[in-house]
Each structure stands twice: as structure tokens, then as C-alpha cells.
């Protein structure tokens, strides 16, 4: 019985280590291997596995609701994510930047 337990443990470990091996996500004609990221304009893509499925995660700037006394300042369009995203500056804190 202990040999069976060792064999099952070995196979489960091997499967966990090879999940997603050789697989990739497609983004605009290029492939991102599982476990890697790709920077593109103001987006960051990550190819990952989730419950034995290959998934593509995309991070991009969120729209912000600007409160009274604050203003939105555009980010540098040539900067990598998240430095390309706009920031919110408010009176009394960072207004004079």
C-alpha cells in the first residue's frame, strides 16, 4: 500500500510541475509562454494556468472618478504599465506637481 501512495504522490507532483508546459497565450500575433508576462503599450499581459486551464490576464489603467478638489493628470504614454496610467492629484497634497 505504501508503494501505491508513493506512486500516486509522484504522479500528482509530476502533473503539477508540468501543467501548462509548452503551452502559451496568443496576443496580437505573438505567443506568451505560461508563467511569463508581456508589456505592450499601456497594458501588461500575463499567461497563467488556473484549474488546469491556460488563461490570459490583462492589466490596464482603470477609469477613475475624480473627487471635488482633485484633478486627473495623464501618465507618460511611453512609460511601462502602470507608470503610463493617469494619477489623481488633490489640493493640499500633490496639487503643485
From Swiss-Prot:
InterPro entries registered for this protein in UniProt: SVWC_dom (IPR029277)
Tissue: Expressed by the venom gland.
A Pfam cross-reference name: SVWC
Top-rank taxon: Eukaryota
Localization: Secreted
Secretion signal span: 1-20
Note in the entry: Negative results: this recombinant protein is not able to act on sodium channels (Nav).
Stated name of the protein: Venom peptide HsVx1
Organism field: Heterometrus spinifer (Asia giant forest scorpion)
High-level lineage: Eukaryota, Metazoa, Ecdysozoa, Arthropoda, Chelicerata
Amino acid at each position: 500500500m505504501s508503494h501505491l501512495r508513493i506512486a500516486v504522490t509522484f504522479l500528482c507532483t509530476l502533473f503539477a510541475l508540468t501543467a501548462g508546459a509548452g503551452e502559451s497565450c496568443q496576443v496580437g500575433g505573438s505567443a506568451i509562454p505560461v508563467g511569463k508576462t508581456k508589456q505592450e503599450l499601456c497594458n501588461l499581459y500575463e499567461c497563467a494556468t488556473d484549474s488546469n486551464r491556460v488563461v490570459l490576464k490583462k492589466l490596464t489603467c482603470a477609469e477613475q472618478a475624480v473627487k471635488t478638489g482633485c484633478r486627473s493628470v495623464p501618465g507618460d504614454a511611453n512609460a511601462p504599465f502602470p507608470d503610463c496610467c493617469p494619477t489623481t492629484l488633490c489640493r493640499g497634497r500633490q496639487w503643485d506637481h
